[in-house]
Amino acid sequence: GYAQGGARVTVSSPGGALPISLADQVASHNTRSVPGFKNGFDSGDIVFVFGGNNDPLTQAALVGAAATTPAAAVAAVQTAGTELATLVKNEILAKGATRVAVFLLPDGSASPRFAAADAQTKAFVAQLFAAFNTALLTGLSGSSAQIIDSGAIFAAVRANPGSFGFTNVDSVACSAAKISAITGGQVTDGSSLFCNASPGVPFNGLATGASASTYLFADGVHPTTGGHKFLADQVWGKLKEFGWVPSNL
């Protein structure tokens, strides 16, 4: 699996941990030559594509900084959604994969990052994520890719958290203050990359009273381990629906 912090669909730019675009990641997979590892895709693979979240987040930040217009931002995320669909069709499906699941993005405006934003900002952020998803769906129309709507999945848990074992779906589990202390002031945004739930000091970065199992969000946009398990459980059910794994597993 590939997971690179800050990655966008086709733009490789500074920021994040290893911000190589999804397009470059797939190209590398298709052309790599590593002893003991195959390159490319085949019918034995189950391929998950869950990316693009940083495109609407980037555009929202640019609009907030008056570095672009709202109309240009919407157009940019539409382009990114279309580019992701093209990537899936031309570089994954056309290269041998037959079981490909593509995730729609969850509504970023409902994440803790925008909890303090005004209604207009939240509405615009929601518009950006919806525009990306619409372009992605349109671009994949007629292809064999299966769609997993992560937005609907997370909306369900926000609507009734207790039924899924969560006690908090609004606040972050990681403490920005503790992480700042742990990193000597090098990380001040509470990024979950630097958040450790292991008990005891000095490296536990959880907020007082928080739980990595029962809080949905670790930081402003990333799920906790409990959030990831919840998503994985839902995806496992989808794989059964698709007929990709036995229904009795």
Report residues per predicted region.
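Structured, solvent-exposed acidic/aromatic patches
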Residues: 79, 90, 94, 101-117
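Structural recognition of the beta-strand scaffold that forms the well-ordered cores
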Residues: 1-4, 45-51, 55-58, 93, ...
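A structural motif corresponding to the C-terminal end of an alpha-helix
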Residues: 40, 86-101, 131-148
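Conserved SGNH/GDSL esterase-like catalytic core that processes O-acyl groups on lipids
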Residues: 1-82
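Stable alpha-helical elements in mature extracytoplasmic
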Residues: 22-25, 80-84, 88, 128, ...
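Serine-dependent acyl-ester chemistry module
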Residues: 56-75, 108-130, 156
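Extracellular/periplasmic catalytic domains that process cell-envelope and extracellular macromolecules
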Residues: 35-43, 47, 93-95, 142, ...
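Mobile gating loops/cap/lid regions near enzyme active sites that modulate substrate access
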Residues: 112-126, 138-221
